[in-house]
């Protein structure tokens, strides 16, 4: 199969592929730049490299260049400590790291993109490629390609089953795992997203999530497969993002619930040109859903994982009207089921589809990961009679107290409705009698007593679900994509 970027350069060449508000690259520009850089990357003779990058056009060129050079990319979370980065890269035998940000890491060859000479210094906002390397460009037809054609520089085809990217799970409930994502995985995910969410060549997708995460990288894959425009943003600033939404004909945006909340606080009270607001990474509260729908915001709640190359469950605004607690229905190209449902229909969510990884690179032990072709997500879920899927908690987060199963999400939902509590999380606390009992961590600027909380929670929860321990904290630990890091609270 021809590389998707190569196809877009041939068929959709003059369409804007990527812009950061200052510079804009057409698909022709992007392909030419990536192919020329790929030729230089081949000189490093690496089949797998780490990428320590920001959300920038240069980073996107680097990603495509690696793929054109048949190099697997291992994405590095830039918020990790040096020790965490080292452990991750060593676990998958990475020796060289390309970066667009300053990085010092012992034991690796670090190569800054600024130190690699290629043509990408003088791309202008009008989409014309300057001749900075002495390469002559054939402009006799609508497709602008080097006379030293990319086909003579690189192989323009690839194998769908080759590894495209490697990402590490967020590690919110345990050790991080290295997830290999093939081009087939990414393609199946993009097709599923198109079917459940909807996008086309006229889409203008504002990408604010880090591209070292699957939620950010997936936008780039969808774009190059479909041929739409990505508006890349390096850092989230609610005021600036709102201005872009108002002024730049943004049709799609990917957010986590907290960033949507900030935008609504900033004044996102109407959709403007927005057709789809894709949400994921954390649970949506009923209050946020109600507020967003009152503003007629086109919110689509979703659920996905690094192992599934992003979303595979999507809830439309209509679904959220009917069932605010749902993450929707599966894409047509995946199959989901509940393993060993209890009397309430709750059990572990299993998924099978071409978007699902084949197995972890590290650790390699697959015990319990796959069963009869289905991947065990580790999430407790329910599928109702209409096909709506509800996600309750991670299996590892389930609190078992005296033989009773307690879902932290149920307690957290009630606690967040207490006046003055802005955030809350419930974890299992060791107990000599019951094995575990619930402990509630909460964020509040008010003075709230344990007795007040017990009285309130007792009105809404069964007695065994009411937390026995409470702790007020300034903040709760979240990852850069808004996922709660419960493992950092288990010590308490």
Curated annotation (Swiss-Prot):
Gene Ontology molecular-function annotations: ATP binding; o-succinylbenzoate-CoA ligase activity
GO biological process: menaquinone biosynthetic process
Record-linked SUPFAM superfamilies: Acetyl-CoA synthetase-like
Lineage: Bacteria, Bacillati, Bacillota, Bacilli, Bacillales
ATP-binding as UniProt keyword: yes
HAMAP family named among the record's database cross-references: MenE
Catalytic reaction annotation: 2-succinylbenzoate + ATP + CoA = 2-succinylbenzoyl-CoA + AMP + diphosphate
Protein name per UniProt: 2-succinylbenzoate--CoA ligase
UniProt function note: Converts 2-succinylbenzoate (OSB) to 2-succinylbenzoyl-CoA (OSB-CoA).
E.C. no: 6.2.1.26
Family to which the UniProt record says this protein belongs: Belongs to the ATP-dependent AMP-binding enzyme family. MenE subfamily.
Database matches in InterPro entries: AMP-bd_C, AMP-bd_C_sf, AMP-dep_synth/lig_dom, ANL_N_sf, ATP-dep_AMP-bd_enzyme, MenE
Alphabetically ordered keywords of this record: ATP-binding, Ligase, Menaquinone biosynthesis, Nucleotide-binding
Pathway stated in the Swiss-Prot or TrEMBL entry: Quinol/quinone metabolism; 1,4-dihydroxy-2-naphthoate biosynthesis; 1,4-dihydroxy-2-naphthoate from chorismate: step 5/7; Quinol/quinone metabolism; menaquinone biosynthesis
Pfam families: AMP-binding, AMP-binding_C
Biological source species: Staphylococcus aureus (strain N315)
């Amino acid at each position: 199969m021809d590389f998707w970027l190569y196809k877009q350069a041939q068929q959709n060449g003059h369409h804007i592929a990527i812009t950061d508000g200052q510079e804009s690259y057409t698909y022709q520009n992007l392909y030419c730049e990536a192919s020329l850089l790929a030729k230089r990357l081949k000189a490093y003779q690496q089949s797998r490299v780490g990428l320590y990058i920001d959300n920038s056009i240069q980073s996107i060129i680097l990603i495509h260049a690696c793929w054109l050079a048949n190099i697997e990319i291992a994405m590095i979370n830039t918020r990790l400590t040096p020790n965490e980065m080292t452990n991750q890269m060593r676990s998958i035998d990475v020796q060289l790291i390309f970066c667009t940000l300053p990085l010092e890491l012992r034991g690796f060859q670090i190569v800054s993109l600024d130190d690699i000479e290629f043509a990408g210094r003088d791309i202008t906002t009008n989409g014309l490629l300057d001749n900075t390397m002495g390469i002559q460009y054939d402009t006799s037809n609508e497709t602008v390609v080097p006379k030293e054609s990319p086909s003579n520089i690189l192989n323009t085809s690839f194998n769908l089953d080759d590894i495209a990217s490697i990402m590490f799970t967020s590690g919110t409930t345990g050790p991080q795992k290295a997830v290999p994502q093939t081009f087939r995985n990414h393609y199946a995910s993009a097709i599923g997203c198109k079917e459940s969410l909807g996008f086309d060549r006229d889409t203008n997708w504002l990408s604010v999530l880090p591209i070292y995460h699957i939620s950010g990288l997936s936008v780039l894959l969808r774009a190059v497969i479909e041929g739409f425009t990505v508006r890349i943003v390096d850092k989230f600033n609610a005021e600036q993002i709102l201005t872009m939404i108002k002024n730049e004909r943004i049709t799609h945006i990917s957010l986590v619930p907290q960033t949507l909340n900030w935008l609504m606080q900033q004044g996102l009270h109407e959709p403007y040109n927005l057709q789809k607001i894709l949400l994921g990474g954390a649970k949506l509260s009923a209050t946020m859903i109600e507020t967003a729908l009152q503003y007629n915001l086109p919110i689509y709640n979703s659920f996905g994982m690094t192992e599934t190359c992003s979303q595979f469950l999507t809830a439309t605004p209509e679904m959220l009207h009917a069932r605010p607690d749902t993450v929707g229905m599966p894409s047509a190209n995946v199959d989901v089921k509940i393993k060993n449902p209890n009397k309430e229909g709750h059990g572990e969510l299993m998924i099978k589809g071409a978007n699902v990884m084949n197995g972890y690179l590290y650790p390699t032990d697959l015990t319990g990961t796959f069963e009869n072709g289905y991947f065990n997500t580790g999430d407790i879920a329910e599928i109702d009679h209409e096909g709506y899927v509800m996600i309750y908690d991670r299996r590892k987060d389930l609190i078992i107290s005296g033989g009773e199963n307690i879902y932290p999400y149920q307690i957290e939902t009630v606690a967040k409705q207490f006046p003055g509590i802005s955030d809350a999380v419930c974890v299992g606390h060791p107990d000599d009698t019951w094995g575990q009992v619930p402990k509630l961590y909460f964020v509040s600027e008010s003075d709230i007593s344990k007795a007040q909380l017990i009285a309130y929670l007792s009105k809404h929860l069964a007695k065994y679900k009411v937390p026995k321990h409470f702790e007020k904290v300034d903040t709760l630990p979240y990852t850069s994509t808004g996922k709660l890091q419960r493992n950092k609270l288990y010590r308490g």
